[in-house]
């Protein structure tokens, strides 16, 4: 289990890095150390590739491609040949490197929460993981960066359209949970860029946008509720209908994960006039239930003891109960007490704890998709991956069929061997996402495109 703890600890670092940590020492980098290095944290059975760059001003950054981390600043940087060190700021267990220059290598240990894993780095930049499905120019369609508004919120995105004058059927892509850019980029994959490319080549106009607080979109995601985000999406539909090359009667929605919660909410809004909806790994049960089952499955897959799983489920259940009861202050105090009760090395950074009880997170935990799914009266495709560990197919497929029973044309399908991103996978673990070259299984792209062209054929 100690090996498992090292793996988990390294993965936990990502939350702190993505949050935008910063800071470095003022020591000038020694010429013998300055520059780029790459190598592996030698976790048994799961080596983790990293790249570290030491700048002339004494600062340093780290890349962890397998976890989607790029150019994350480091602190406590030392670059003497016999003492090379750095630490990742604001991460549980003070993870970092302790080593020295050894000829043309940096050798030492990755240290976190009192545990160590050997590290050897050699000169040179770390290579990006291959992403063979990334669309590459020249594109056989038009691409335009666009902006529009939902009240005080400026929304930025990219609209891709087939060549010609139209009118084209169109769709808005709605991202999954957390702050996502218009490509829904994570772990080096850009699923929404691939989907937009696929559907536009098939004859559809596709709008994909940055979430609140990301890229060119204003606002802050944590301060937004689900009704706020549904209104953002509705503004996207309205924008599409202002374009003369788009058929206003054939505009639909594609939601991934949390986007599968939001798409039916948008369709239920007065005047939305959605023509179709596609839900990729979209939950059909309340958010609290999704999170509890997700914790069970992921923890079990990492070998956690049943007692530890039971404790985590009890914690999530009580926290969810407080949020559903509207006791936000009680939920905040509960999460704070829980974090304070952990050993210092295992505590989450305060900003992570604070993020558990935002309006955005509260919306997720308290949301029940049943009413809006049951209200859908347009063609709907909902599909899952049977190895998904985030939206569990066995938990969601049955309720999805029941909730869509009144829809005039509903298709519910589960793909074998695919994870939450619809990648072919051995286990479905989120830790595998970056290591898989495929962004979305081609069979999924073919299936969804076929479903669309049968129901909303391009003209």
Regions found by a protein language model. Name each.
Residues 29-101, 110, 133, 140, ...:
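Central antiparallel beta-sheet cores of small beta-barrel/beta-sandwich binding domains
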Residues 378, 389-403:
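Short alpha-helix in the alpha/beta-hydrolase fold that links the catalytic acid
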Residues 167-177:
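Short beta-strand element of the alpha/beta-hydrolase
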Residues 126-166:
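N-terminal cap/lid segment of alpha/beta-hydrolase-fold proteins
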Residues 223-244:
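Alpha/beta-hydrolase active-site loop
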Residues 196-216:
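Conserved alpha/beta-hydrolase
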Residues 376, 382-384:
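Short beta-strand/loop motif that positions the catalytic acidic residue
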Residues 276-375:
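Accessory cap/linker subdomain of secreted extracellular hydrolases
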């Amino acid at each position: 289990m100690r090996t498992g703890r090292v793996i988990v600890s390294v993965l936990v670092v990502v939350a702190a890095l993505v949050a935008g940590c910063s800071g470095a020492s003022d020591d000038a980098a020694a010429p013998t150390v300055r520059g780029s290095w790459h190598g592996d944290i030698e976790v048994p059975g799961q080596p983790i590739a990293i790249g570290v760059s030491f700048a002339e001003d004494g600062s340093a950054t780290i890349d962890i491609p397998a976890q989607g981390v790029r150019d994350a600043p480091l602190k406590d940087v030392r670059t003497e040949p016999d003492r090379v060190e750095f630490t990742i700021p604001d991460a549980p267990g003070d993870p970092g490197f302790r080593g020295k220059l050894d000829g043309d290598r940096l050798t030492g240990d990755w240290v976190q929460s009192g545990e160590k894993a050997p590290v050897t780095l050699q000169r040179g930049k770390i290579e990006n993981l291959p992403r063979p499905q990334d669309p590459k120019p020249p594109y056989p369609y038009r691409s335009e960066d666009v902006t529009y508004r939902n009240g005080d919120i400026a929304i930025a995105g990219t609209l891709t359209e087939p060549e010609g004058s139209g009118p084209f059927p169109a769709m808005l892509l709605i991202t999954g949970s957390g702050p996502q850019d218009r490509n829904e980029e994570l772990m080096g994959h850009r699923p929404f860029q691939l989907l937009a490319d696929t559907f536009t080549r098939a004859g559809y106009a596709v709008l994909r946008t940055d979430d609140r607080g990301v890229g060119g979109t204003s606002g802050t995601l944590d301060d937004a509720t689900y009704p706020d985000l549904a209104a953002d999406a509705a503004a996207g539909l309205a924008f599409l209908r202002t374009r003369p090359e788009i058929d206003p009667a054939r505009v639909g929605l594609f939601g991934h994960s949390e986007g599968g919660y939001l798409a039916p909410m948008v369709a239920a809004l007065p005047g939305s006039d959605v023509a179709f909806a596609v839900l990729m790994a979209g939950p059909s049960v309340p958010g609290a239930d999704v999170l509890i089952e997700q914790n069970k499955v992921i923890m079990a897959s990492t070998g956690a003891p049943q007692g530890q799983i039971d404790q985590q489920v009890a914690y999530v259940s009580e926290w969810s109960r407080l949020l559903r009861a509207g006791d936000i202050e009680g939920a905040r105090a509960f999460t704070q007490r829980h974090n304070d009760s952990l050993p210092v090395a295992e505590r989450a950074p305060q900003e992570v704890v604070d993020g558990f009880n935002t309006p955005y997170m509260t919306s997720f935990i308290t949301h029940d998709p049943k009413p809006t799914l049951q209200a859908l009266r347009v063609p709907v495709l909902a599909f899952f991956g049977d190895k998904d560990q985030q939206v569990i197919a066995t938990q969601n497929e049955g309720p999805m069929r029941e909730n869509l029973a009144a829809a005039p044309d509903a298709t519910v399908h589960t793909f074998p061997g695919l994870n939450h991103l619809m990648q072919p996978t051995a286990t479905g673990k989120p830790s595998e996402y970056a290591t898989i070259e495929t962004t979305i299984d081609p069979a999924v792209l073919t299936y969804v495109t076929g479903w669309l062209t049968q129901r909303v054929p391009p003209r």
